[in-house]
Amino acid sequence: MASFFADDGADELPRTASHPFDADDDAAPDASGGAAADDTGYGGYASFVDGGVEDVEEEEEEIAVESEGVPIGHVSGGFSPSPFSPDPELDGGDGPILPPPAQMGAEEGILLREWRRQNAIVLEEKERKEKELRAQILAEAEEFKKAFYEKRIQNCETNKVHNREREKIFVAGQEKFHAEADKQYWKSISELIPHEIATIEKRGKKDKDKKPSITVIQGPKPGKPTDLSRMRQILVKLKHAPPPHMMQPPPASAAKDGAKDGAKDGTPAPANGTKKPAESKEKPANGSPAEAEKEQPAASE
């Protein structure tokens, strides 16, 4: 069995100097006879039998202790490792060859890889569209800002011109107001009241045709109108029934004429200079004037 697992070139037996089987039969035997028989027979193996096998066994035992696996001895004296022994590892360890499962990623299928590829393409397209839309919005914003500033400058120039014209009209109106205030002060007061009054807008379809009973003007605070109806009511009342200190004094010529007439008739002149008609002292002969008027139609009949 040992020679069966050995290498092909390692099972050659050592050659001896004598060849017993190749001896020439025609050779003449030696005179002594014994010496010739030893040379031509098995005499050449005497040294091998005398202790040669023991030396080989000792060497085999020593090598079997030091070597790994099952050593196989050869007749030639060499040994080869067993074919069933494990192969020595390169790194010198006996751990696992593959990395741990935590470090190994999950194996992705074909559908998952295709989905990831399609998703990456969709995300790139979406990002590109967002960048284009952002650039478009910024461009439109710049154009809007430019147009807004141009329009604002134009409005400012127009407002300046209109304000100058309104200021001229206002100054002329103030001069006219102060010139005519002492002559017709009630008219001047009525002109101070604003005529253009903003109406209250109410929500709802039913309130469109209805108008508020009180018209108000917007006050200094937004959303809180100022009510001027009471002011108008007081001014109208003062116009129709002015107090004594607001009554106009009579002209100087009318006052003098009234004083003279009063002195002649013996009646005092009124304060405002008006002259009352003189009452007739003559009484009708037939009684009261009312009775005379009643009798006149009867006489005509």
Swiss-Prot record:
Subcellular location(s) of the protein: Cytoplasmic vesicle membrane; Membrane, Coated pit
Cellular-component GO terms for this entry: clathrin coat of coated pit; clathrin coat of trans-Golgi network vesicle; clathrin vesicle coat; plasma membrane
Ranges annotated as biased composition (Low complexity): 29-51
Keywords assigned by UniProt, alphabetized: Coated pit, Coiled coil, Cytoplasmic vesicle, Membrane
Record has Coiled coil as a keyword: yes
Domain of life: Eukaryota
Record flagged with keyword Coiled coil: yes
Comp. bias regions, Pro residues: 243-252
Acidic residues bias (residue ranges): 52-65
Any one GO BP annotation for this protein: intracellular protein transport
Segments forming a coiled coil: 111-147
Primary location recorded for the protein, binned into one broad class: membrane
Topology term for the membrane: Peripheral membrane protein
Composition-biased stretches (Basic and acidic residues): 200-212, 291-301
Residue ranges, annotated region (Disordered): 1-103, 200-301
Region of interest: Involved in binding clathrin heavy chain: 102-164
GO molecular function: clathrin heavy chain binding; structural molecule activity
Family: Belongs to the clathrin light chain family.
Quaternary state and interactors: Clathrin coats are formed from molecules containing 3 heavy chains and 3 light chains.
Record's function text: Clathrin is the major protein of the polyhedral coat of coated pits and vesicles.
Protein name stated in the entry: Clathrin light chain 1
Organism encoding this protein: Oryza sativa subsp. japonica
